[in-house]
Amino acid sequence: MELNTIKPASGAKHAKRRVGRGIGSGLGKTAGRGHKGQKSRAGGYHKVGFEGGQMPLQRRLPKRGFKSLTLKYNAEVTLADLQVLAADEVDVPTLKQAGLVGERAKVVKVIKSGELSKKVVLKGIGATAGAKAAIEAAGGSVA
């Protein structure tokens, strides 16, 4: 096989349909657009969501919620995660290294989920009231 002999498989290529070129083509006169009306005219069609003047669905339904753009910079860590962590002093870079929070995380908060039995010192990390109590009960602190 040579590069100059390669051609597409039969049936893979189709000739462009030429509309409005006589009765014999099957798409003559109105070119498959029917008679009159907005859809038959050049450049004539409605915008997306237009319902003929009726109030469109996206305007009939109530506005609801939003997606926070700061969410990708926030992260949560559980007490169980801190239990398996080797470090005694925990800060955001330590958690990133351990793979417990994403690389883009800026704000980290510890939530009370699981048990904590070892002493842990949090630096620059927030904690819920329950998590703070559990950390202090284990001999740690939240700075």
Swiss-Prot record:
Gene Ontology MF term list: rRNA binding; structural constituent of ribosome
Record field: compositional bias (Gly residues): 21-31
Ranges where the record places region Disordered: 1-51
InterPro entries for the chain: Ribosomal_uL15, Ribosomal_uL15/eL18, Ribosomal_uL15/eL18_sf, Ribosomal_uL15_bac-type
GO annotation terms (biological process): translation
Paired cysteines (S-S): none
Pfam families: Ribosomal_L27A
Keywords: Ribonucleoprotein, Ribosomal protein, RNA-binding, rRNA-binding
Any one cellular-component term (Gene Ontology): cytosolic large ribosomal subunit
Subunit structure: Part of the 50S ribosomal subunit.
Family, per entry: Belongs to the universal ribosomal protein uL15 family.
UniProt function note: Binds to the 23S rRNA.
NCBIfam families per UniProt: rplO_bact (TIGR01071)
Record-given protein name: Large ribosomal subunit protein uL15
Species of origin: Methylibium petroleiphilum (strain ATCC BAA-1232 / LMG 22953 / PM1)
Phylogenetic lineage: Bacteria, Pseudomonadati, Pseudomonadota, Betaproteobacteria, Burkholderiales
Gene: rplO
